[in-house]
Amino acid sequence: MTIPDPANIIHNDAGTASPHHIWADVGDSTSSSQHEATRSRSDDANGGASASMHAPQHVKANRAAQPTYDSSDLPSFGLSARLTRDSSSFGSKPSSSASDSRRPKFAPYEAENLWATSSTTSHPSKASQSTLSPNASVFKPSRSLQPNHFEPHAVANVHDFDDPLNSAYSSDTVSPRPDHAPLDHEQPQQPSALDPVAVSKVEEQRGDHSIPHQNGLVSAQAQTASDAVSTSKYTTEAADQEEDQDDFVYPGADSPSSGQAAVQDEQQAVTDSQTTKSLTKQESDPEASSTSLSAPAEAEHIVVGSAAEQSLTSSAPAETAVHIDYDTLAQLCSRGPLSDLQSFFHTAQESGLSMFSLSNDPNPGNGLVPLHFAAKDGKTDIVRWLITQAGAIVEMEDREGETALHKAAMAGKLSVASLLLSHGADANAQDADGWTALHNACSRGYLDLVRLLVDRGHAQIDVQGGRGAWTPLMNAASKGHLPVVRHLTAKYHADPFVRNAAGETAFDVAAATFEVYICEILERYEAERWNASKFTTSSPSRSGAIVPGRGPYEPLALHTTIPVILHENQRLDTRLQTLALNGGKPRWSSSSAARAHKPDRRSPSSMPPGPLAPSRTRHVPMRQDDVGLPTRSLPYKLRLRSRVGPAAARRRAAALAAQHTPNPQDCHDDDLASTPTPESVLQARRGTSSVNGASAQHADAESSHFWLCEWQLDTTHPLVDVEHGWQYAQSFDALDDKWSSQPPPPLERLLEGRGLSASVTRAITGGAGFANAQAEQEISSSSWVRRRRWIRVLRRRLDIEFGDDLEACEGATGAGAEHLVLSSESQSNGDGSHGLSTAAIMAAQEAAKSECSQLGPDADYVSRAKALAGPSAASGATPADAMGADRDELARRIARLVMANTELRAAFEDDDVERRSRAEELRKEYALQLGQLREAAGLDEDEDEDAADDDDDEFIYPNSYKDDGASVFTRLVNGETSGTLSRPSLSQRQSSAASMLRNSVAPSEAGTSLAAARSADLAANREFRVPTNEAPNKVVLRHGPTMREQNLQPQWQRDEEAKDCIGCGRHFTFFLRKHHCRRCGRIFCDACSSKRAQLRMAELVVDPSLPSMAASEVLAPTRVCNGCHAELQLPPQLQNMRGADAMMAASRSRGADEVSGRSILETQLEDGAFRSTLAPPSDVSSRASELTECPVCSTTLSALGGSEEQEAHVRNCLENGGGGSMQGGRYLVYKLPEDSPIVGKECSICMEDFVANSTIARLPCLCYFHRGCIDSWFKRGRECPVHARDW
């Protein structure tokens, strides 16, 4: 009967073929070449391909040189030939055990190996029944047991080789170690499976005396095969799961199953020896082949069981593997010395561990290798030995993905970083979060490491790392490392406009951490980059991207977080009076900083020049309260209130009056300008309405930013005192590098009271006793100033869309036209000496561009600059010949020189040294000619004169607010020149007109296009209306001021809304009180509202919370502001109606509007005279002006009878006190009723409110005071505290 092949029954070779396409020739005999054509079944399962075709050449040679028979003169089979992993074409992983055994990673056929070991009997032993055998780890094909595989004629192919995935871990292979004497922990050689004595002894040890019958072999095999299939699935899944969990074991790490693997390897050697001898004997006796098929299986089964039992006794000696003390290794690498570390490595090497495995073995606690420990602690000799001798990998990463270079850069180890770079470390390697070594060095401020990484390691400067996409410049700026920031910007030209994931630049992150001085450095660097990138063709890549050179540099448009800086200025006061009061020592004084006779006088609080300041060339007086947040309508401009001195205000008011007055004879002198007149009120009325409207608009405007902090001292500047923030110098005009953080020795002597003889002598003699230069030098040495910086940081609101991509590109016009195109209003109002012809400028630009285009595209920037300048600016020429030319010629030459200077800016990026030198010389020559031409045109003189006026007059003097602010001119000019309410200057008006058209006009190479500038001129002309395609208006509009809808009823201004006096601009304090004008309802100081006027009930404006206040205010003259008092002096038909009169006039105007279709409220200015179409106001209704109760006793007047009786009662109460008593005929004293209209009003003496049932004194002038206050007052005089009148 033919025995069925179990391989064909339960195994499908084609379906379960290895993905590596490598199969082992399990029955490969190399005895004869006559059976070479016969292939093993393993080759058939592989589609006829032999595994040897994939073998390396050295494996093929070894296989060809192997002997046909072994030492026992028996054929050698592939089952007994083991191929180590070192010889495999797949490579190998270093093992942690001395026996070099590892748990298999590829074992898809364990089940058939199990079937082969358990097929000898239907009643397997307990050892093979309880669980999988330790040796059943890899499938050994079952067809190795078939007769055709054991025929002596089976010939192996010379190209065959053992599969490393099977043979290396097969339980039927021998140990790869060469023949040698048994080691101490090895078991002695097991007896052969065919030795009956040995077999019987083994069976007796097992306790199993049943011998399987031969004829039951096939049935037992078939029965066991089905169980093996299901078991193989479980075993395969378990092996795959273990492979996922332990995919890679670092070299040198102890495996938990290392002892078991060593035992398995020894048992495999014993089992293979027994099986080989049994199979050899069976082949040598063909007649007994039919009766001894079960012999090998039995022998193998017996040996497996005995090996399992022997594992208990052999496991103890196998667990003597080398244990690595990782803590000691880390300490030796971190602290050394090198000799101890070398001894540690030699000891481990003698125990079976290689130096390569130990040097690259990570610490199980933190994942660091020895190279990481040595690098972060700066052990250069250990790092060098680990790399060159121990074989440490330079690019080995830890759990965070950091290399040794990351560790050295973070710790600042320069020598280690240099050594790593010399051995091939990558300076641009990123860790798991994207940080590079340059990020680490910049974050810690190691300038030497930054230079090393960039110069030698070629690290990328603008690389973005981390989850926030930060650049190295951002890391250095946010941590305040000034030297690194300077080096990255000055030498390596880092891009300051790169944004991180939050849309912030390096400037923003520095401002957010209050590194203000670094913000100043970055601001200057950004401005230089911005100006150097003008007129480029780059376009924004995405919304919100920064395009340098597009328009003016505006920090508020480019950044989200910006600091505002103010200077507190003081001067050393060495006057004789101060020395006498201060014990002979000088003192610092803020008021002395603004002395008029000092050439470097400075306001006590000023804003330095910059992009955010009103001026870019000089310090502007500015208090902390004067700085406001930008509004949503103007998000890129700070709201700043500029302070103007009284003298400058009067001069500017006179100049403004001269512009509006056609004849100079009608102008008033400066001394009369301080007194309000009806004419001044009429001239300023239009300006008052516009200023008030703008003030209300900005007061209610929503801010686009918010403050991150309050005002605080800045100590980030390297030249300031770290404790108090002061800087010391001998003049406020000293350069920044001339200031010192500590008082110099001469200043210290002065502060101690020494070296003041010159100051005292000068004070006594008036300066007449100084004749030599030494005395003058001594006097100058006593002049010292100091300042400190106050900062406040504002940040953009996140809930507002700004559209930076459009706003930043708003000013896309050239800088040349911005300096040249002047408002046509100044040309029309003046004599033509304050501006140049725009038409001439535009014509010159067109001609210059035409000449430049003829040079062709290959011309360099020097040639183009010469062509733009024209022949009039040839080398050696001077503009002296243009002094007598007309202004159009001057405008043309100036325009061409500006274009030439703009073209020469390309020299900043030119690498040609010679050409850059010629461009620099040419630029200096053109700048000289341009200055002379501008001087000839009279452009610089006006600007210098304005600057001189501002320097002389625009200062704040403490306790110097002596001007009563009565001048309407002064008040209105103050309002126009304060903050955002000021009328823009000439250049600002030009810029505003140009910015309205910039979005629709493409930028030109040399400046603003001709159409844009012409449109700006036309838009500035009041008489010009741009024609459109819409239908023409049927109604001809009048020429005159545009009327705006406004509330005709004056409103009572709340106290919390007023911080400064509207008249003089002084800040309200405890000593400077607030006063309401009863006619306009606005708040003024006492000096600006000292006038009294008798108002009608319809004109009164009272507090809405105290409606009964009108009854007391109408009886006597009440407080009005100086402007309302001046307006009341006008004829009735020219006065502005207030209160009820205005409401009734509005009602009449609406009725007239229905009839005539024209508003009766329209006004106009013709020939300089004001004419109003308002009708004379009618008398106030008696019902509205009647008193309902007595103001003294609060008696209802309607119950007293007619008007005569009411007037008599009020007169009697006023004269006799209405139940009160007149103290000595001077004032009336009475108890204040609860319903009195003056309850809640303020006593002018103690500033406390009147309370019901308190004792009140009323003077004959109807002024009310507390009884105790007026008694104390009259002890010092006999004048009313309000009216200063004797009683």
UniProtKB/Swiss-Prot annotation:
Annotated positions binding Zn(2+) 1: C1061, C1064, C1085, C1088
One GO CC term on file: endosome
Residues that, per the record, bind Zn(2+) 2: C1077, C1080, C1121, C1124
GO MF, one example: transferase activity
Motif (PAM2L 2): 941-960
Residue spans of biased composition, Low complexity class: 86-99, 981-995
Segments for region (Disordered): 1-298, 582-630, 643-697, 934-960, 977-1005
Subunit relationships: Part of large ribonucleoprotein complexes (mRNPs) containing RNA-binding proteins RRM4 and PAB1, endosome-binding protein UPA1, core scaffold protein UPA2 and associated factor GRP1. Interacts (via PAM2 motif) with PAB1 (via PABC domain). Interacts (via PAM2L motifs) with RRM4.
Family note: Belongs to the UPA1 PAM2 domain-binding protein family.
Name under which the protein is recorded: FYVE zinc finger domain protein UPA1
Lineage, highest ranks first: Eukaryota, Fungi, Dikarya, Basidiomycota, Ustilaginomycotina
